[in-house]
Amino acid sequence: MSWAQFRQGMDGRLEALAEHLRTGSWTSGPLREVAITTYTGKTIPSVIPTVTDRVVQRAMRGAVEPVLEQRAFADWVSGYRAGRNRITALRDSDRHLREGFRWVADVDVRRVSEGSTAAEVTDWLAEHVADGSFLRLFERVLEPLPCPLVPGTALAPLLINLRLSRADARLTGLRTVRFADNYCVFCDSTEQADEALGAITGALARCGLRPNLAKSKVWTGVNAEDLFLIAG
């Protein structure tokens, strides 16, 4: 079914969908698995859910996003958030650089959308949401996916931030800016930046993640515009 077809008699479709969700009779539709090729030639596994499933995913995201914005996401995190994008990350970075913190521990997270289960992701959400019936439905929505954070769903961007928020919470006291899955910590010496690199690595390890070593480094003499570049 296309979006155009869904819109025909949409009120009735939404009422029926709400009833299925309320009674527990809802089941997910078939997924179309695709491979997206980036401009650098890298291939990223992705999925295309049915229109109805995307409606469910968007509704669930709309329900939990305000809660996570208030309880889970740090002020220094941009990307996958309303009003917080690469521009806000660059502004925050420029402020730290202008204050004299010219050494940057720059860490890109390796395969952030891989290596989790529906039950595990639901446990992350349960740290902030106490509604048991919602959490059970949330887990049911994730279970058919090849990976709960796989690109292509309406929930994936939010869940990437939820996953990384668990590492973010371990980085208190540092001048940190994160854009999507890229951390930068601003320091006043090489030694401090090396320590920050270790702190990020340790925080990620506690969450089952690790840096992409090919894209992570300590550097200085950087302009804000050089940071958070998308390399595909």
What residue spans do the PLM features occupy?
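Conserved pre-catalytic core of RNA-dependent polymerases
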Residues: 1-150
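Generic preference for hydrophobic/aromatic residues in regular secondary structure cores
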Residues: 28-33, 211-218, 227
